[in-house]
């Protein structure tokens, strides 16, 4: 009987742990979606203060043209130059979030820029995001063109 009670208790405790992780993952997922939305907003409004708040100091970015931006200063400068030279409405739609551990996730998003002439540039973006002091930040960005473009 003791073994049966122990088994039941073990299963119950394990299920509680998984329920908590699911709830935490849902909360973290929403925080990450909000982070990507803030990134999009900061690019559209050219808000460097917001960008510096949501990017890690050692961020690196590989843009679709093959150019690397390393470090927050280079990344912010390049993002502002790109937003100015490639105007249009930017849309980032998160397609998937994969947690590598509770503090690191990979985020895949569809990235579209609607140009002033009505054409749409369609790309993919992958973000590596990390939780620093209970705030999610972008640590790396990879922009790529889909095959066939």
Model-assigned labels for residue ranges:
Residues 1-23:
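Bacterial Sec-dependent N-terminal signal peptides
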Residues 18-53, 57:
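Short, low-complexity N-terminal intrinsically disordered segments enriched in polar/charged residues
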Residues 39, 51-52, 59, 71, ...:
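Hydrophobic pocket/interface hotspot
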Residues 55, 65, 96-98, 103, ...:
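A mature extracytoplasmic/lumenal domain signature
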Residues 59-70, 81-85:
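A short gly/proline-enriched turn/hairpin at secondary-structure junctions
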Residues 66-69, 113-114, 144-146:
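Solvent-exposed loop/turn segments at secondary-structure junctions
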Residues 76-117:
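Surface-exposed, charged secondary-structure patches
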Residues 122-149:
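Short beta-strand edge/turn micro-motifs at domain boundaries
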């Amino acid at each position: 009987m003791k073994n049966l009670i122990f088994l039941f208790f073990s299963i119950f405790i394990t299920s509680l742990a998984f329920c908590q992780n699911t709830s935490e993952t849902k909360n973290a997922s929403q925080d990450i979606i909000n982070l990507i939305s803030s990134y999009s907003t900061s690019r559209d409004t050219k808000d460097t203060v917001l960008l510096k708040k949501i990017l890690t100091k050692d961020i690196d970015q590989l843009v679709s043209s093959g150019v690397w931006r390393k470090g927050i200063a280079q990344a912010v400068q390049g993002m502002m130059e790109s937003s100015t030279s490639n105007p249009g409405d930017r849309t980032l739609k998160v397609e998937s979030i994969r947690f590598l551990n509770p503090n690191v996730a990979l985020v895949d998003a569809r990235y579209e820029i609607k140009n002033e002439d009505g054409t749409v540039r369609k790309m993919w973006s992958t973000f590596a995001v990390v939780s620093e002091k209970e705030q999610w930040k972008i640590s790396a960005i990879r922009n790529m063109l889909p095959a066939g473009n």
